[in-house]
């Protein structure tokens, strides 16, 4: 494999020897865009092939018992695929990309170029209530990362290609090139320059062109705004209200996802997760069929004014023409979508939260429009409120108002709703950020100190690892030693601080050389226990603790050296502030190269 990689690299050098670095990156961006577009096409074909073969023959006027079975089968197949073939974590695609950027030098395993396609399509095709975007983004990012690896690019350029792949994949699946670029700039990229934007644009345009060639020009959500759907000034209070509702729904989305995840993590056996996940998901889809799969058909029906189609294959099919039943059904589906999505992901399925956030947003906007039209007799456009609601919830869930605004603007073939999109997306973002400042992608990474942000100073610290900076060449002193016992020990020491440990290796204090100097040559004091000279450390660092947290302890305690212990309190080594700062400077140079 290494020999093959060397040959590819030499051929790459031969072909590009007369090109500048910028031209090489533009050329590689085209390659990434083409491959990301092909990957998206394969994903779509596999997904719709599975889904169509399983449910297209169901009668629309009654529920089908297979809705109880399909989701469990999909979760089991996806879990077995991941456990026995992939043997790696391919869930939470966007989070995995962020983790690779912060902890793996933007290196993503080669298998991610195809395994997310198989796992995601299997999960969603069998009814898993998740979105295809996260697996496809991980696929595109893996393509970019591995092309960067083959070309032996540095960290900065590899990261740029990774982002090109992620943005290109998203652009291809929605046929929305601007959205792909904005998504990367808003969520993924740390260092934004003119030189990085051009390859992003090229990759997104190339992938979108591939999508047009392979799948036609029809958008994923075929909707055209009619004159009756145009924005009017009197609707501004309603869009403000919609923004608040979307912010609350975004907070519910994120918090419920965490709660369901915690529930499944408390289950010790995988087969129990299958049983619980299959049962919960099967029952929800049996009662609310719009929850099957990514859910695009559901909010497409709403945007076309065909809310009755939501009742196809439902137990409530006979009540589809009753207005208040429609409203209750839409609201219930909206809330249960989050539970269905979280259950799918945490029970073993492979998928993302992108499409579910659009689904919940669409149903939130449609609910408000239906209530206004039914209860108050107003003529509010369900199409407009459905589209704007999609942007609202997505803005809050992902903490990405610009991505949500441009996505809906591109999907609706124009910017007629730009003002309400901006109003609702910004208010939703503000409400959700007030309730929970982390997005659904960043919550776990921030808690672990592994999140890259647009604050470059903080982000550089994320790259540093405690175990790589810890120093271990300190002479240890046992707690039962006397001054006489350690005089000969410290005479050969290169350090001026010594950890004191008990018989179990636990750190109980430290001894500083300066505190011993006065008595070192007084033989009458050699019998004094070392505890007479021992002091407690200013603070302790726990193994694997984030460097940002370590620096905060240094600042709080005004210290320059702190001991590192494991979770049981056993001594491991010391970490110095000066070594962290030196590593920080080296990492900053590496990023900027």
Predicted ranges, named:
Residues 507-510, 571-574:
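Glycine-rich acetyl-CoA-binding "A-motif" of GNAT/NAT acetyltransferases
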Residues 142, 512-515, 576-579:
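Ca2+-coordinating acidic residues in Ca2+-binding motifs
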Residues 473-477, 532, 537-540:
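Structural signal for short hydrophobic segments within the conserved structured cores
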Residues 1-468, 472-473, 477-498, 502-508, ...:
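Alpha-helical transmembrane segments and immediately membrane-proximal extracytoplasmic
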Residues 477-494, 500-501, 520-523, 540-560, ...:
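The conserved cystathionine-beta-synthase
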Residues 526-531:
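PAS and related sensory helical modules
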